[in-house]
Regions:
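Surface-facing alpha-helical segments and adjacent helix-coil boundary elements at the starts of domains
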Residues: 1-231
């Protein structure tokens, strides 16, 4: 999988950042990015490229965010699964979590904007822990978003035990808020979103099996066929 964040992905990141208004030396960025990249596993590559981006973007997060707020307009839609640039946007979404945590008023809308490029389900998690009320209010709004990627983020980003992701101790202890989000998404028109809802319930069941059984029984009472199909996977 790490091959999806190699040299081709670095070149794509450079091109799109420059097109979005960044001002740095392509040669310098590329040299920094490729140094030791081949020795790193996937998640370490993400962290390495975040460091490189921070070195070459404005040090002020609000100024850097103005560049990232334009990057989707210049992002070629060629990140096919297994392809050489599939994970190219992952360092960009996680950059927001690493350097924008103290600016939720900028970062949360930015994650909404970026998540169609590569899911922000990992990047949203520090905001849930640090700015819980403000983030939850955004998640409720995202449940109604016209973009399925944004709606899925409201579910996948709140999974208490997301694989590869930081666990959410507050939601492991009390998943009430998560269940409320899932109530809004259980009949989502997108199977992509409904599968995330089922996976979230699976996570919750590891710590609160009775709550998930009660929730599934309640949902089955008036379930449309799509909802029934989703609940089969729990």
């Amino acid at each position: 999988m790490k091959d999806g964040l190699g040299e081709a992905a670095v070149d794509k990141i450079i091109h799109c950042l420059l097109e979005a208004g960044a001002d740095f030396s392509t040669e310098s960025f590329r040299k920094d990015a490729l140094s030791s990249l081949h020795t790193l596993e996937l998640k370490d590559r993400v962290r390495h490229l975040i460091l490189v981006m921070h070195r070459h973007l404005p040090q002020s997060f609000p100024k850097a965010a103005k560049i990232l707020q334009k990057i989707r307009d210049h992002w070629p839609q060629d990140d096919t699964p297994g392809g050489p640039t599939y994970f190219a946007a992952w360092p960009i979404t996680n950059y927001v979590a690493t350097h924008g945590l103290n600016h939720p008023e900028i970062s949360l809308p930015l994650l909404r904007y970026l998540t169609p490029l590569y899911t922000a389900e990992f990047a949203i998690r520090p905001f849930i822990e640090t700015h819980r009320k403000q983030t939850y209010e955004q998640l409720l709004i995202w449940c109604m978003d016209s973009d399925e990627h944004v709606r899925r983020l409201a579910s996948e980003g709140t999974r208490p035990r997301l694989p590869w992701g930081k666990q959410l101790p507050s939601y492991i202890e009390d998943p009430t808020e998560v269940i409320s989000l899932l109530e809004n998404l259980r009949d989502d028109p997108s199977d992509y979103v409904r599968r995330s809802v089922a996976n979230n319930l699976n996570d919750i069941s590891k710590d609160h099996p009775d709550l998930v059984i009660e929730t599934c029984e309640r949902w089955l009472q008036d379930a449309v066929p799509e909802r029934k199909l989703s609940l089969i996977h729990i």
